[in-house]
Amino acid sequence: MTDREEVVELRGHIIDSLIFSRVLDTIMEMGGDFEILEFKVGKRKTDPSFAKILVKGKDPEHLREIVSELRKYGAVPVHTQEVRLEPAPADGVCPRGFYTTTNHRTFVLFDGEWIEVEDIEMDCAIVVYPEERRAVAKPIREVREGELVVVGDRGVRVKPPERPRGRTGIFGFMESEVSPEKPTPTLIRRIAEELEWHRKNGKIVVVVGPAVIHAGARDDLAWMIREGYVDVLFAGNAVATHDVEASLFGTSLGVDLETGEPVKGGHSHHLYAINEIRRVGGLREAVEKGILKDGIMYECIVNDVPYVLAGSIRDDGPIPDVITDVMEAQAEMRRHLKGATLVLMMATMLHSIATGNLLPSWVKTICVDINPAVVTKLMDRGTAQALGIVSDVGVFLPELVKELKRVRDDEA
């Protein structure tokens, strides 16, 4: 074998998850060549498959580029060396050439042992703590001077998601594609069943934009919070503002939520709502004083559902609960996403993509938006596990709540 050739191995459900074909396609697309040295197909549904492939490049550097790309699919060189570690030169600075993570399960070979990287998310560095035999994914800004950072991709193994073997629900039904479908009863029923399962067995994070209120689905989301289908809520200043506006004035953006007609002087209602919350000190104080008596934020507070309101450069006010430091908001989102098993994103491109960037690839994700480009952007930016449903949230959410009630009645 020459310095232009290297043998890599693939293990797992590499056929029906299309990993094997993607590896071969990548080699050819990058101008390389390959030879399949060994290929064993699992005979039963639970049996993994195995492939050993000789990868050929035009020169050593070209080979290195190909093998580096193949690592994203879980390919590991047969003669794997241990990770190369270098100390961070300063707080918030990594060594040059540091390894940048994907959002897939990742392992590093250290002291003869494959160690799984904790807190994995895309676009981070990997810090190894030798005495604790731990490896942790960290954003660049959180790396401290002297910490040992993985440099290059030597000794790194990535395990991309495989096609689910057991219960798949809506995720098996939709096969991870952006769906142009309207929310049919069958589709929404499957989503409701998924939510019910995660309500009992997991942790549901819901990410929403203000269209939930504008489109008249505020009461439906409030019901979901009250009934335990929301463990954490992510939103921005606008959601809280228009939710309070709806509670105090019955309007959203100055439009009567019952009649759909603009209200005289309604253009000021959201500012009056912000001012009222600022006057008493915050949303919780407004609930305690009996000012805020219903709605999304009310249900979060009375049901002890944590929320993260992340600020934007265009915000009015903002409401005191809003985190205006974006790095602090991101850190809070990251903290609350730990242990999440299902994320439901509705009618917000900004917060959906921000949340998606923090998620491991095995967390089930549903994105609902009237604009198909939002779902496409979310997936293009790395959240490839997202299931997209193109729908008006004002239609989708009320139907989802109806199906959730039916699911609960059926199980009663």
From Swiss-Prot:
Q: Which residues take part in binding NAD(+)?
A: 237-238, 316, 348-351, 369, 392-393
| Function (record text) | Catalyzes the conversion of ornithine to proline, with the release of ammonia.
Cofactors, names only: NAD(+)
Q: SUPFAM superfamilies in the record, alphabetically?
A: DHS-like NAD/FAD-binding domain
- Pfam families according to UniProt: ArgZ-like_C_1st, ArgZ-like_C_2nd, Saccharop_dh_N
Q: What is its EC number?
A: 4.3.1.12
Protein species of origin: Methanopyrus kandleri (strain AV19 / DSM 6324 / JCM 9639 / NBRC 100938)
Q: Does the keyword NAD apply?
A: yes
Describe the reaction catalysed, as an equation: L-ornithine = L-proline + NH4(+)
Can you say what this protein is called? Ornithine cyclodeaminase
State the family it belongs to.
Belongs to the AgrE/ArgZ ornithine cyclodeaminase family.
Keywords, A to Z? Lyase, NAD, Nucleotide-binding
Q: Which InterPro entries match?
A: ArgZ/ArgE-like, ArgZ/ArgE-like_C_1st, ArgZ/ArgE-like_C_2nd, DHS-like_NAD/FAD-binding_dom, LOR/SDH_bifunc_enz_cons_dom
Q: Which domain of life is it from?
A: Archaea
Q: Does the keyword Transmembrane apply?
A: no
